[in-house]
């Protein structure tokens, strides 16, 4: 009996329609999981597994630009109205961008999408997680976090410098893992396990998409990096594998890894918490 068969339930996956998120969705659908997909764009139209799951309602789709608080709030409200429970939450949406970009709220896009939004989704779906059996959150981080040499939480919203992959992207992933570490004891007291995990190097190149990868990395990725199912497996194991009872840990290659700049974890958590309580709470209000 596989892990999935033992723990079959309902998983919510952000960024479920491409790359690692798509492979995680396909893996879990094949094992009989119910999947809630929170995505910005559509699934591939030629994927028979996905199409069949949509028709049978094993896969239920909610669409929003996650970096737009008004759209995100609307989608999360719909999920809370329509869904009964969430056993596993995979905060997986994100990516590396080719330049400094900003969200509708005015913050740097890597930080908004990959640090702030996972916190918002986790907070907003706590009630559904409490109704689930597994009550587990996995935040998709990156080993790029370990390359950060200087870290200042005050510059995350409006960085003054940009470097592909190793700049705001890496800082946003480090910040994600830091607040995950800091929040974990509070959630564990409520019965919810949260941890962050690096899905490893995967060939996630998409034709026609301008990525934030350094030019030299693209041919290396194409030739040598494994299929995104590799990363999906690592995220799956982060939720259900041997570390499933450990709150707050950061996993690289399924190994617990010490975070750099852990002294800033409370400050990062305070920042994302303030954005959630002040800005997100007011999103979508008239006047």
Give the ranges of each region predicted by the language model.
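N-terminal Rossmann-fold NAD(P) dinucleotide-binding loop
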Residues: 21-22
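C-terminal helical subdomain
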Residues: 218-259, 266, 274, 278
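A glycine-rich helix->loop->beta "capping" turn
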Residues: 58-59, 77-91, 97-102, 133
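Catalytic loop of short-chain dehydrogenase/reductase
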Residues: 94, 98-102, 108, 130, ...
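Conserved glycine-rich cofactor-binding loop
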Residues: 17-18
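Conserved glycine-rich Rossmann-like NAD(P)H-binding loop of the short-chain dehydrogenase/reductase
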Residues: 31-47
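Rossmann-fold cofactor-recognition segment
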Residues: 53-70
């Amino acid at each position: 009996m596989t892990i999935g068969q033992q723990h079959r339930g309902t998983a919510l996956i952000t960024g479920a329609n491409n790359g690692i998120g798509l492979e995680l969705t396909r893996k879990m659908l094949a094992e009989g999981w119910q999947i809630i997909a929170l995505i910005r764009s559509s699934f591939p139209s030629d994927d028979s597994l996905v199409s069949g799951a949509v028709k049978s309602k094993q896969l239920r789709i909610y669409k929003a630009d996650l970096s737009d608080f008004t759209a995100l709030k609307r989608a999360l409200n719909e999920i809370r109205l329509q869904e009964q429970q969430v056993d596993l939450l995979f905060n997986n949406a994100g990516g590396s961008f080719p330049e400094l970009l900003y969200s509708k709220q005015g913050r740097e896009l890597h930080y908004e999408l990959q640090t702030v939004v996972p916190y918002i989704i986790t907070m907003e779906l706590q009630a559904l997680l409490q109704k689930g059996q597994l009550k587990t959150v996995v935040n998709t981080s990156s080993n790029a976090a370990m390359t950060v040499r200087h870290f200042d939480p005050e510059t995350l919203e409006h960085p003054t410098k940009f470097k592909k992959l190793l700049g705001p992207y890496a800082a946003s992933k480090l910040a994600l893992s830091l607040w995950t570490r800091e929040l974990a004891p509070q959630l564990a007291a409520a019965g919810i396990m949260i941890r962050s995990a690096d899905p490893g190097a995967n060939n996630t190149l998409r034709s026609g998409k301008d990525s934030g990868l350094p030019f030299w990395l693209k041919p290396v990725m194409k030739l040598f990096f494994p299929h995104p199912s590799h990363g999906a497996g690592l995220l799956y194991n982060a939720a259900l594998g041997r570390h499933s009872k450990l709150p707050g840990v950061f996993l690289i290659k399924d190994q617990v890894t010490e975070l750099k700049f852990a002294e800033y974890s409370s400050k990062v958590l305070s920042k994302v918490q303030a954005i959630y309580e002040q800005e997100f709470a007011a999103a979508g209000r008239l006047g």
